[in-house]
Amino acid sequence: MSRRIEIVEVGPRDGLQNEKAVLEAPDKIEFIKRLEAAGARRIEAVSFVNPRRVPQMAGAEEIMAALPREAGRSRIGLVLNERGWDRAVASACDEANVVVCATDGFGIRNQGAGVAEQVAALETIVKKRELEGGPPISLTVSVAFGCPFEGEVSQDQVTAIVRAAAALGVGEIALADTIGVADPWTVRKRIEAARVAAPDARLRMHFHDTRGTGLANAFASVEAGVDVLDASCGGLGGCPFAPAATGNIATEDLVYMLERAGFETGLDAGALVEAGRWIGERIGKPPVSALSRAGGFP
């Protein structure tokens, strides 16, 4: 039996958050349904952030209410603080993904808080869940390979956050190349260090293809033993607080690469291409994935 790689679809959240064309909730709901029809089982569907700061993420509660609970499907809500956690719990999210930035410079611009304050917020959320219940919590360490404001990010900066999350019992930890500056060699080193810092946590990796290294970084992660990768249908993506950051690795391109190499993903690359074209028509931007241009093979 071939090894299975789980792909977390982040198009409805990370993919859309930086688009100028603000979509209404019904279009976002339809996009999620199309992705699920293509085989996506874990989808970062919404973000519980202030809609005044990120208008594209408005309507999170409406979207969650419109998605029927289904066994085997997980709709993830992004959370930055206790207020976001409370909204995620009230909306019956299947998972909450808490983000902690690896640098103060990015954290203050993106979340209005430095690293120490963000880690404290994570601790508050974890303890609140222990007392009151709520969905499983994962952590994403953003700008884990480089920061648009502070430049290089050291391995020690990243592993300090990973170690803190592990001490709190966070079960899944992701390292995110938010601005697309990572390379496969550094990726392997960060994975090794994260495993030492959090030996019991499941690792997930999140790459952008800003400088053309996204798929190489994803494959390096798989070779290093990582079984969970984020990707965005159509290669949508960016960050409103990260200048020049462009799209995530395209889900359909990642599926093509992995399945050609003999891995299982459970996703239909052709259906993903069509979903990418559908959402592209609504935001006025064609998908940037290679598969949407060249098609699959054979």
Language-model regions: role of each:
Residues M1-P298:
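Catalytic cores and adjacent flexible loops of soluble metabolic enzymes
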